[in-house]
């Protein structure tokens, strides 16, 4: 076997090895990314034309009849801003029912401090993404003010609605979009 043949075989072997390594890394990355995204976002979301679903329990019941649907959970979602000691950050606020949300998302696995169980109706608790909490400089037990864009119309103009919430938990998914821009109430 000539020197050129040896170099050629070595080059082909090195190329195949590099291809195998790259494909393995990409497959692992794809699986990790899918796991993280589907841990906080469902495969399918059903929304109404105007964003509301008046009869969602009936719709959920119909969806559950499909053999490939494993679970469903209702939520409401809106944009808002949080204010703490002059620091203001915008985020997506998602209203959930923790017991039902457990069937479709893995938020409990991502909780760094606090608990989803403290999200109780009327308690005004909130769970923040880790980067959002860091940028607001808050920890579990601190208060944040939610500024909702839907306000009250007065003679002086539209006054936004303000409500104080207690941080009952902080989660970290590992994806900036969720960690810096999502809050659960």
How would you describe each model-predicted region?
Residues 3-5, 17-41:
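Alpha-helical transmembrane segments
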Residues 6, 10-13:
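Alpha-helical transmembrane segments of multi-pass inner-membrane proteins
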Residues 11, 41-43, 69, 90:
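A common structural microfeature
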Residues 12, 50-53, 77-80:
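Short active-site-proximal "capping" loops at secondary-structure junctions
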Residues 21, 25, 48, 182:
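Small/polar loops that bind or transfer phosphate-bearing groups
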Residues 30-60:
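Membrane-interface junction motifs in transport/secretion proteins
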Residues 57, 61-184:
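A structural signal for hydrophobic secondary-structure junctions
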């Amino acid at each position: 076997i000539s020197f050129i043949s040896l170099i050629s075989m070595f080059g082909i072997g090195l190329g195949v090895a590099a291809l195998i390594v790259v494909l393995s890394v990409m497959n692992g990355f794809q699986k990790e990314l899918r796991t993280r995204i589907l841990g906080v976002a469902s495969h399918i979301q059903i929304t109404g034309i105007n964003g509301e679903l008046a009869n969602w329990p009936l719709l959920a019941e119909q969806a559950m009849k499909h053999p490939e649907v494993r679970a469903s959970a209702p939520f409401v979602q809106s944009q808002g801003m949080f204010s703490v000691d002059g620091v203001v950050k915008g985020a997506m606020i998602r209203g959930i029912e923790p017991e039902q949300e457990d069937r479709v998302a893995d938020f409990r696995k991502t909780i760094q401090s606090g608990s989803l169980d403290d999200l109780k109706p009327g308690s005004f608790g909130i769970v923040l993404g880790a980067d959002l909490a860091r940028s607001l400089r808050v920890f579990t037990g601190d208060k944040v003010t939610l500024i909702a864009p839907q306000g009250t119309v007065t003679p002086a103009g539209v006054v936004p609605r303000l409500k104080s919430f207690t941080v009952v938990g902080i989660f970290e998914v590992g994806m900036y979009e969720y960690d810096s821009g999502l809050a659960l109430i």
